[in-house]
């Protein structure tokens, strides 16, 4: 084998190893703005004011993640969010908190409306909460966790 081929194989191997190492690292932040950006893939819109946030993405290629977000928004923004994501008010009340440890700041009371994507699916734990009086919202969204 020529030296050129050996060098090429070494470079490809090195790039492959580097790719595997980088793609196997989790993403984790307790910064609300970064959490929003990792989750949404976009900048924070002017209509919302971030208060707290946490985001964790597993190192797996399947893109498993968990988001906790507290923010304030106007009613119009949240209504559009509910419609776009096809959320409905949770009337069943599944134990969506039972499989996760919520951050200490993730606290709602009975004034919050709780929305879900599919409340009949006992394994669908993502919830979207809004206090219509204060405009405070919480998002707990999980995929594959």
Where are the model-predicted features located?
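Compositionally biased regions
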Residues: 3-4, 24, 43, 117
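A general structural signal for short secondary-structure junctions and capping/turn motifs
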Residues: 2-5, 61, 129-131
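Short linear interaction motif-like sites in intrinsically disordered regions of transcription factors
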Residues: 2, 40, 78, 97-100, ...
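Intrinsically disordered, low-complexity segments
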Residues: 21, 38, 58-61, 114, ...
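A generic structural signal for short, non-catalytic loop/turn and secondary-structure boundary residues
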Residues: 14, 43-44, 107
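N-terminal export/targeting and maturation segments
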Residues: 24-80
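Sec-dependent bacterial lipoprotein signal peptides
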Residues: 1-22
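Extracytoplasmic electrostatic interaction patches
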Residues: 83-145
């Amino acid at each position: 084998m020529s030296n050129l081929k050996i060098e090429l194989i070494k470079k490809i191997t090195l790039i492959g190893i580097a790719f595997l190492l980088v793609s196997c690292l989790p993403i984790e932040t307790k910064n609300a703005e970064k959490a929003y950006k990792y989750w949404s893939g976009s900048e924070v819109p002017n209509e919302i004011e971030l208060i707290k946030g946490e985001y964790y993405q597993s190192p797996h290629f399947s893109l498993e993640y968990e988001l906790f977000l507290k923010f304030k928004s106007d009613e119009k923004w949240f209504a559009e969010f509910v419609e776009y994501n096809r959320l409905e008010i949770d009337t069943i009340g599944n134990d969506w908190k039972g499989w996760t440890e919520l951050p200490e700041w993730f606290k709602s009371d009975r004034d919050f409306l709780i929305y879900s994507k599919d409340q009949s699916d006992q394994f669908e734990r993502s919830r979207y909460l809004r206090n219509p009086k204060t405009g405070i919202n919480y998002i707990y969204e999980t995929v594959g966790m």
